[in-house]
Amino acid sequence: LCGWNILNFDLPIILRRSWALGITPTRLLDFRRYSTTTTIDLMQILYNWGNSPGPRYRGLKEVAKMYNIQNDFPNLDGSDVATMDEETLIAYCRNDVRMTRELAMRTRGYYWK
């Protein structure tokens, strides 16, 4: 499982919601720092879990730009999600997934196998 900031945002929300609904996860995930056994959090890895000098973390779009990864929605961010129509929301989410995947493919072999 690979994502951007998934250890601090996406997965805790999904797990708490699953717990509230009585849905047991189909597999257990490794939330330990510095581990890439079951979960690869690209933000944590690229910024050494907040231990790098300089800015503690940067957003996916900023990092994608540094790696010359195309962003089809440069003027939108997560704060705009509530006002997006369904078609734009789907395209926005697909764009984030594509950027994350491309970033993962470019960094593979440097931080994990």
Q: How should these model regions be labeled?
A:
Residues 1-91, 95-99, 103-112:
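Metal-dependent phosphoesterase core characteristic of DEDDh/y 3'-5' exonuclease domains
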